[in-house]
Amino acid sequence: DFWSFFHSRLYHVVLLTLLSLLQLSNGIVRLLGRRTNPSLIFASSFLIFILIGAALLMLPRATYHGISFIDALFTATSAICVTGLVSVDVSSTFTSEGLFIIIMLIQIGGLGVMTLTSFFAMFFMGNTSLYNQLVVRDMVSSQSFSSPLSTLLYILGFTLVIEAAGMGVIFLSIHGTMGMDIEEELAFSAFHSISAFCNAGFSTLYGNLGNELVLHNHNLLYITISFLVILGGIGFPILVNLYETVSYESKRLYHRYVKKNKRTIRKIHLYNLNTRIVLIMTAILLVTGTVAIVVFEWNHAFAGMTVTEKWVQGFFNATCPRTAGFSSVGMTTFSVQTLLLMVVLMMIGGGTQSTAGGVKVNVFAVVMLNLRAILIGADKVNIFNRELSHDSIRRSN
């Protein structure tokens, strides 16, 4: 019944987790109030969560046959830092409790320890000092002086909505095809949706997403995971900017065509320069990478696949090297040309303030524009009829 829930293990786990986050948030707020270096707090918070995660993964219920401290530490570090590297086979080593610990570490790492703890501090403890709010505003790349809490809510809201939508589509794509019951399918869908959006690349399948259970006739699964990786890799400021633009355009169209009032909302351009650069560069890298990989691997690594599967695998393998660690084809089966292309894609990475790595597409775009300006002898670096500041160019170089 209802009251029995308060005596269940799940209730105690959730309660202890919330209390731990509140205590950590309170500690971070006190440190910020002392003008402590936010970068030092950021690094220390990651280290604390890594050590806690490693300790939890060594618990008897987290694994089937036990795990060494080095393997637990490596797995926890990889999960928090969303790299996707593992020293043990995830599917045969960790129990459902262990997988839950891993996915929570991935979620914390994907959102950012500081983002998560700052949200708890502001939401449950009220407004903090102006200095603390400015630090948080800078941390989440908010351009306005409105409450950082609203920006943090945007980030958490976007994360939950996108991951829930991804979970639903993944569930539909695998339902009744992998020999799992409903609970296992839901757990599989939730794990891979979070892992994809956070760009972690962890999978519960042996051999990652190259497992024979999903390699063929699961194009929707690969496409869904690819788009989750892309959304997580473009960065939260881009997602917020896109939301604001879509919200504005929806209101404008509503007033114009439903209320027949053309003067109510004036049309303006809300896409900022950063959003345009990231979206255009992402599209260029995806299209170029997909076409190149399909051409290189048509009769090589993709031999035996249908035409549709080849293009889906090309898109998937052009998406994941930049930001995530998923794999659907063994790396040893790829041609040298594809491996070199993947090295370049990994180096470029995703957008700033995202879950992706690399030098970032923003930086890569500025470097290329600066190089072009030098080659043609231009005094200024322009893009979309706007001049890039010398400070932006200096930091990118």
Where are the regions that the model predicts?
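Membrane-proximal intracellular helices of multi-pass ion channels
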Residues: 1-397
